[in-house]
Amino acid sequence: MAAPPAKGNTEQSEEGDLPQLPVSPKPDDEQSRSQSPTQLQDSPEAGGEQEEEQAFLVSLYKFMKERHTPIERVPHLGFKQINLWKIYKAVEKLGAYELVTGRRLWKNVYDELGGSPGSTSAATCTRRHYERLVLPYVRHLKGEDDKPLPPTKPRKQYKMAKELRGDDGTTEKLKKAKDSEERRVEQTTPGKTKSDATGQTQLPCQGSSRDSTEQLGPVSGPSPPLTGASSCPEAYKRLLSSFYCKGAHGIMSPLAKKKLLAQVSKAEALQCQEEGCRHGARSPNKDIQDSPQNLRGPAENSEHQLTPREGLQAPGGSTRMEAQVGPCPTAPMFSGCFHAYPTEVLKPVSQHPRDFFSGLKDRVLLGPPGKEEGPTTKESHLVWGGDANHPSAFHKGSTRKRSFYPKPKACWVSPMAKVPTERPGAPSPHPSSPGLGSKRGLEEEGFAHGGKKLRAVSPFLKEVDSKETGGKPAAPGLAVSCLLGPTPGPTPPEAYRGTMLRCPLNFTGSADPLKGQASLPFSPLVIPAFPAHLLATTGSSPMAASLMHFPPTPYDAVLRNRLGPASSAWHMPPVTTYAAPHFFHLNTKL
């Protein structure tokens, strides 16, 4: 290795036979003092001390080299290079290393070396240099084992040792605490989502709502027909679970709840469009029992399940209609999602207001006859959001067979309360007859821009005259749905032929915005109608007896009672025969 940087001076003449040994360098003033005449007079004592110092340094360098920790350079302390012989003698004079360390005498050692008195770290630096350069050799001389160097500060020694002893235990405790916390969060989150989704299987929480809606498609695609009804609740549940997994821990403010419901409604509608087309192409031609489940959000308290069995067309050409209607719930919530099946039956995914009228049957929405060819061959675009390029969820099925009732026109109920209304001057995307089309435009314009306080118009079933339908014969088997709420666009006039259920189409046209769009957070109500041949043939049957005349009710009362039982808003007098009252126009004052 490298030689010692500083060589000792040559011994005096009387010790000339000793070899030249490396000694710790001395400053010039010390060397001049050592060479002073007074020290030259005491040359025998000075020579013996220098000889001892030189022997010590030779053996020290040799030992440190054999120990593989050679002393390549001697550090400076207090603006002076350390004299290893002096520091060794000072520590031995004060009682060896252990006693100096125990009594905190390293500052005295520093003073013996003649360092600058203003140094703040003098004691610590002196001790470290001694431990690194001299202490191993001193222990070797005393026959002690070469122990590892003790910690720097003895008072903090106890705390550090205590922390080191408990290090493994504390880390294990921290890991166990983290694991238990993660398990507890994982247990609470599935419980929350299960209570929201009413017993459905828990799906993994996704990072964003877009990923969850994209991954839902291939999962629920090849499922049995029941997944067609549960795909929208699963989309709602996955979005809700992803919201809770982002750190909300089950606590939602009202504003966050409204935002979440809006996001869920958008994603739900898009998902239902994809799933409706997918299930519409794969459903078998047999009775399909649908179990729509009422979506219960964080703020809902009641849960009611409805199991409508919608019969398909019998061989004789008649339609079998059966429904099992449960008791009227107190606070229903609506999702407004539908699926289209190849048998032209419109399946509701969740509970709708038509289920709360015990006399009304859960029915199909049928369209005009003989419109499969000609200018209406193209699909009537049920636009939601104003984008007509996206495929609708209500494409016709793959079956082309002719049935007693022709191809129906699906009725889309928007899950959003705020739907952009079309301009009154915009051309209608649906083919319309001249007479009825102009009347429909005037009616919608009057309701949308009238600015008057609207009153609920009593819905009645009435045959449309052939004059209003453009001189064409009315088909007896057609019925339409009445939308109590904002409509995405003008309804095709062909859907109003035959038996009709007349209801105001724009309840949100009120001048008071708080009573209009803001007060309808969920889907507008849907009141189904019936084919005319059933009304004509059932005379005093229970369904005919259950037809009700709804008295004119203020719009405020309708809003107050829209979440309550139907009997509180409209009374149902027993009717034995069907009376055809006069025709009401939408812009007629009551």
Curated annotation (Swiss-Prot):
Changing R128A: Abolishes binding to STAT3 3'UTR stem loop structure. Abolishes binding to TNFRSF4/OX40 mRNA. Expressed in T cells (at protein level). Expressed at high levels in cartilage, heart, testis and bone. Pfam families: ARID (PF01388). Disruption phenotype: Mice are resistant to experimental autoimmune encephalomyelitis (EAE), a T-cell-mediated autoimmune model. The expression of pro-inflammatory mediators is severely reduced in EAE. Residues 1-52, 141-229, 275-323, 367-402, 419-443 are annotated as: Disordered. Residues 1-294 are annotated as: Interaction with SOX9. There is a cross-link at K80, K89 (Glycyl lysine isopeptide (Lys-Gly) (interchain with G-Cter in ubiquitin)). Residues 33-42, 187-210 have a biased composition (Polar residues). Residues 160-186, 367-381 have a biased composition (Basic and acidic residues). The keyword Transmembrane does not apply. Induction: In macrophages by LPS, IL1B and IL6. By IL6/STAT3 signaling in T-helper Th17 cells. It is found in: Nucleus. SUPFAM superfamilies: ARID-like. Its main location: nucleus. One of its GO terms (molecular function) is chromatin binding. Interacts with SOX9. Interacts with ESR1. Interacts with RORC. DNA-binding protein that may regulate transcription and act as a repressor by binding to AT-rich stretches in the promoter region of target genes. May positively regulate chondrocyte-specific transcription such as of COL2A1 in collaboration with SOX9 and positively regulate histone H3 acetylation at chondrocyte-specific genes. May stimulate early-stage chondrocyte differentiation and inhibit later stage differention. Can repress ESR1-mediated transcriptional activation; proposed to act as corepressor for selective nuclear hormone receptors. This is AT-rich interactive domain-containing protein 5A. It comes from Mus musculus (Mouse).
